[in-house]
Amino acid sequence: PNIGTGGGRDYLSAFPGSREMLTRYDVVFLGDVGVGRGQLSAKDAELIKGLVEQQGSGLVFMPGRRGNHLSLMDSALKELMPVELDDARPTGVGLQNESVLTLSNRGRGHLLTRFDADEMVNDQIWKMLPGFYWSTGVIKSRPGSEVLAVHSELRNQWGRIPLLAIRSAGRGKVLFMGTDSAWRWRRGVEDKFHYRFWSQVARWMAHKRHLAEKEGIRLSYTPETPKVGDRVFLQATVLDEAGFPLENGEVKGEITWPSGDGDQLDSDQLEITEDEGGWGVYSAEFLPQEGGPIEITISAP
């Protein structure tokens, strides 16, 4: 807000303000942007929430020094924020001395914070990364969130201040990065750590949307490696011929698994229902009858 617009081949002149336009995006990054004039609208916030919860996209909160992110707490996105923000410090906290992100026990073994397979080496890398002087005002993490890294110097009655935290939201994932200085990780090593971190974030967030994808249908399933007796939940995002989310469509599903003798195939129809919200999401569930490769076919005639 209040700065000149950019340009370029992939530049967006305006926010994709409809389900049809937004559904193509795997990850949304929100910097020093809130809800207000020249920024997001309340409807935009609701669309982002729907994209994450219904279609399994990712959302990254990256607050800045203007404090615009606090206005998001009066929007639909409040429920998705992994931390409780400190509204008494709208412009964040600045220190004279450099601080660093300190990995939590959860962060030491998480994919997003892994620069080396050896946890001890990885921990040393994080300690040596160029630090920061400014951070978002945060009180604590919210219930259901996982804290991957905390402020090396600041703490309150709740403990160390969480600056890197994640949480699930419906079918999607959300990440909060409470410092704007990750770009400094390029110092002396170019994009070795900076690029790797953000590429890991993007892949982690977009993973479920691309488990199976063909001809306007994306299929995701939980758990990804089911065992006999585990109930499997399927979500199919279906687009119409124009590439928009299919509403009130006829979506069919069939599950095929090998029979006990391994030669003859047996199949059943899946009972598929459309989820509310108009995001083109259709759901089904089943119990695996036996081990082995299972084939799932989803079609929208």
Describe these PLM feature segments.
Residues 1-301:
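N-linked glycosylation sequons
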